[in-house]
Amino acid sequence: MINRRTFSIGLGSSLLAACTDGTVPSSAPASRMRPVPNAGWDAWVANFKGRAASQGISQTTIDRAFAGAGYLPDVIERDRNQVEFKRSLEDYLAIAASDERISTGQQMLQRYGPVLSQIESQYGVDKEVVVAVWGLESRYGARRGDVPVVSALSTLAYDGRRGQFFESQLVAAMKILQNGDTTPANMTGSWAGAMGHTQFIPTSYLAYAVDFTGDGRRDIWSEDPTDSLASTAAYLSRAGWVRGQPWGGEAGTVSGTPVAVLQPQTPGPRIAVFRNFQVIKRYNNSDSYAIGVGHLSDRIAGGAPFKASFGPDATGLSLKDRKELQRRLTSAGYDTQGADGVIGKNTEAAISAYQRANGLSVTGDPSVALLRQLGG
């Protein structure tokens, strides 16, 4: 099986996009994703149609799929200008298990409680884990992506950098349309073709998506997240989820014999992980992602934050200090676009503006001295 994140644009792209100083979102606004004429793409599509037909795609489906499709140069720009984000676990968890993400997750757990309990009963995957995946993948449906999937995948396949992979996803998208699960207009997602509340790529959709509502369609694009949540549980279940076993937790706080004890950041908490931790990594092959999902699920369920401290960073500032620095900068008129304690481009720009306005050396770097200078 192709891991649904083999094409990943970085560590938890949707998650990072939601960060105060996060990266560009995994899906650009539709207004920026406008098709432009491209003779090369036209020729590629003409040839692809024959290949799609040879794999059982009807002419009607092909015609419907490409009726409004086009070449999207912004997709190529994003694919060629990816940045691999290497955040510390502390920063990652500050985003993944932020107060807002926890409280919203708890609201969603309550709102969809009955159906989530049914999903948990059928697939054996903790409902809090399913909600946590939803929270990290699309911010509980707020960032599902609005890029036309057929246009995005055909553009990427034509470009050729990972042409074979994206063509396989495009064929899978054609099969989804042919099955009647959605329409070309409704088949939207990220610029890389990940779709729905929990960001399934087309091949994973074909293999794992389920119709939990019983309406005859596996509708992961609907405002109703039921099919998406059930599909995520089905995916994790088939990946080997062990019913009733924890994903892990801070060492010394979970019972049972873990398969490993990790300490991704020193100083920082030691994380005891069980088999279900590896199952989460089948969704996104990253230790930080799996810890983020697991810890967020625990917090949604009412669990406590990790006890062990990460300590100050290289600048001498703790997470609490960095949040306070962002608040003070914003209060002084230098907006950091929020206060999550993660130092990124917005905070660096605010620091630079403050330094410039006050006759200081412009570095954009946080420091204990800067925090003190900003006062209370």
Across the structure, where does each feature detected by a protein language model lie?
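N-terminal export signals
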Residues: 2-25
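Sec-exported extracytoplasmic/periplasmic mature domains
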Residues: 49-58, 67-71, 121-124, 135-139, ...
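Compositionally biased, proline/threonine/alanine/serine-rich low-complexity intrinsically disordered stretches
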Residues: 19-39, 63, 310, 328-331, ...
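Short acidic, glycine/serine/threonine-rich helix-capping segments at coil-helix boundaries
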Residues: 317-322, 330-376
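Acidic/His-rich structured neighborhood in mature extracellular/periplasmic domains
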Residues: 90-230
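An acidic, Gly/Ser/Thr/Pro-rich helix-cap/linker signature
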Residues: 20-120
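Flexible, glycine-rich surface segments
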Residues: 184, 188-283, 288-290
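Acidic, Ser/Thr/Pro/Gly-enriched interdomain connector segments
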Residues: 274-290, 295-341
